[in-house]
Amino acid sequence: MPRSSSSSQYRIKNLTHSTVAVRDIAAGEELTVTYVDAMLPRAQRQARLRDWGFNCTCAHCAAGEAEGAESDARLRRIAELEKKLDDFDDRSVTAERGAELVALYEAERLDIYLGHVYTRAALNFALLGETERASEYAAFAVGAVEREFGPEAGDIRSMRMLAEDPQNHWTWGRRRYD
């Protein structure tokens, strides 16, 4: 079920607004943006939209109860994983937790956040000393962040360095539990 296909940025500095596609858009497909926090459970997203007099009929909001419950469960798991990844004292964090996080974001079609989540996964792989996966996810992060924010966006330089030479990145091996 597709969600937002594009992201909007507002730049106060020069009073500009831009909307960019965060994934490939098929010919004839509408550009979509989200008006509420996409990480909220479905009922909360719909309630917030109703507060604005809007009844969303996108495929994601119109899905059946079972699909909605599965989606909400994935969102809860995302929140759990992000909390674990943020806790450097949590020894249950494995290298694969970052990949699991990416898979959940992809399953939820949260394309507007993929730059962020690929970056997180790449850093987690590097922190745990996984060379190939750190490089792979850093390259994904570069592509997603660059697509959304441009070639000079934050984290691009660090992700390029991580993609090219994981073992010399500042995060390398800092979360190993030898």
Predicted regions span which residues?
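C-terminal SET catalytic tail plus cysteine-rich post-SET Zn-binding segment of SAM-dependent SET-domain
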Residues: 1-128, 133-136, 143-144, 157-161
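Membrane-proximal bilayer-interacting regions
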Residues: 138-141, 152
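Long amphipathic alpha-helical scaffold regions
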Residues: 147-151, 155-166
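Alpha-helical linker/edge segments of TPR/alpha-solenoid repeat scaffolds
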Residues: 160-178
